[in-house]
């Protein structure tokens, strides 16, 4: 069996899809379906069982057995970079992750988890080294602290432990994320409403490493299949502008004039204006597949969003 926490969420459900594509259906999805709309991410996927997150955590703490587990993909967390309830964030993203990590280490179960580029903060160098890490929000701090915890226990680990610092992920199955969904998702919705697509004023200076979720899932699967351990950046290695995203959306629809709106006050000083993954460490593992450009990935995503 394979366990995917956050399996009804954005990246988790794409990992489930990638596993299905390999012929694996013996999957336990763990999630919190209080937001009932997330069920839609699982409708076209094949899984063996579902478990509520709180019940799962209780079972993990109690040391309950789930049978033979080939891997755990831990994507379940609070992913809202705008959430400022530190107690809630640390419980969800740090304490929960530690419990699950030790459960896997004790049973030598390969453990793959979601970290984040938010661990870096305001830097021009995005390399998996302590000197470049300085998160700007409590979400980034929770991910940073767990990475530090993993770094300390990795030398003693007898089974793979692998963290992925996701950069700006976009693509299918993010509909439930609301304001935290990707720019491409929001621009598509604006055009469908008959509006012009809108970017924040000054965003011509913002460049992000936008990575397609299918590529993210592929790296997770490859690292599992190859027994990789460590903490790795997961982006394309190439920063592109928000304008490039908007241009790809407009080109797909064949309509829309890009407008600018004021930059939100609450995001100032808490916003990464530039991200670009240094992929040297990931490439050193032997992973050599290419990543989709914004033009390629957004076009594929638009086709998925607007399918009949």
UniProtKB/Swiss-Prot annotation:
The active site is at 139 (proton acceptor), 177 (proton acceptor). It catalyses: ADP-D-glycero-beta-D-manno-heptose = ADP-L-glycero-beta-D-manno-heptose. SUPFAM superfamilies: NAD(P)-binding Rossmann-fold domains. Its EC number is 5.1.3.20. Binds 1 NADP(+) per subunit. One of its GO terms (biological process) is ADP-L-glycero-beta-D-manno-heptose biosynthetic process. One of its GO terms (molecular function) is NADP binding. NADP(+) binds at residues 10-11, 31-32, 38, 53, 75-79, 92, 143, 169, 177. Its cofactor is NADP(+). CDD domains: ADP_GME_SDR_e. Pfam families: Epimerase. InterPro entries: Epimerase_deHydtase (IPR001509), Heptose_epim (IPR011912), NAD(P)-bd_dom_sf (IPR036291). Pathway: Nucleotide-sugar biosynthesis; ADP-L-glycero-beta-D-manno-heptose biosynthesis; ADP-L-glycero-beta-D-manno-heptose from D-glycero-beta-D-manno-heptose 7-phosphate: step 4/4; Bacterial outer membrane biogenesis; LOS core biosynthesis. Substrate binds at residues 168, 179, 186, 200-203, 208, 271. Keywords: Carbohydrate metabolism, Isomerase, NADP. Signal peptide: none annotated. Catalyzes the interconversion between ADP-D-glycero-beta-D-manno-heptose and ADP-L-glycero-beta-D-manno-heptose via an epimerization at carbon 6 of the heptose. Homopentamer. Belongs to the NAD(P)-dependent epimerase/dehydratase family. HldD subfamily. Contains a large N-terminal NADP-binding domain, and a smaller C-terminal substrate-binding domain. HAMAP family: Heptose_epimerase (MF_01601). This is ADP-L-glycero-D-manno-heptose-6-epimerase. It comes from Haemophilus influenzae (strain ATCC 51907 / DSM 11121 / KW20 / Rd).
């Amino acid at each position: 069996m394979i366990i995917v926490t956050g399996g009804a969420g954005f990246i988790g459900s794409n990992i489930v899809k990638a596993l299905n594509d390999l012929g694996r259906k013996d999957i336990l999805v763990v999630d919190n379906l209080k937001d009932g709309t997330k069920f839609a991410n699982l409708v076209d996927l094949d899984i063996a069982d579902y478990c509520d997150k709180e019940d799962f955590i209780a079972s993990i703490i109690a040391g309950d057995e789930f049978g033979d587990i080939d891997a755990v993909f831990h994507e379940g967390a609070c992913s809202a970079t705008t959430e400022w309830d530190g107690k809630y964030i640390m419980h969800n993203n740090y304490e929960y992750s530690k419990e699950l990590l030790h459960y896997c280490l004790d049973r030598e179960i390969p453990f793959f988890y979601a970290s984040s580029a938010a661990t870096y903060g305001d830097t021009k160098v995005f390399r998996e080294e302590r000197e470049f890490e300085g998160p700007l929000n409590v979400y980034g701090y929770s991910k940073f602290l767990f990475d530090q915890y993993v770094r300390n226990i990795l030398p003693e680990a007898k089974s793979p432990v692998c963290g992925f610092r996701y950069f700006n992920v976009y693509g299918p199955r993010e509909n439930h994320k609301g304001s935290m969904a990707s720019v491409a998702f929001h621009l598509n919705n604006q055009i469908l409403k008959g509006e012009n697509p809108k970017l924040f004023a000054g965003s011509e200076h913002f460049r992000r490493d936008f990575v397609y979720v299918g590529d993210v899932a592929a790296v997770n699967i490859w690292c599992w299949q190859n027994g990789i351990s460590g903490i790795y950046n997961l982006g394309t290695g190439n920063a592109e502008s928000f304008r490039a995203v908007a241009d790809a959306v407009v080109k797909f629809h064949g309509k829309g004039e890009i407008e600018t709106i004021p930059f939100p006050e609450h995001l100032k000083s808490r916003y990464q204006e530039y991200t670009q993954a240094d992929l040297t460490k990931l490439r050193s593992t032997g992973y050599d597949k290419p990543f989709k450009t914004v033009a390629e990935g957004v076009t594929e995503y638009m086709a998925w969003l607007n399918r009949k």
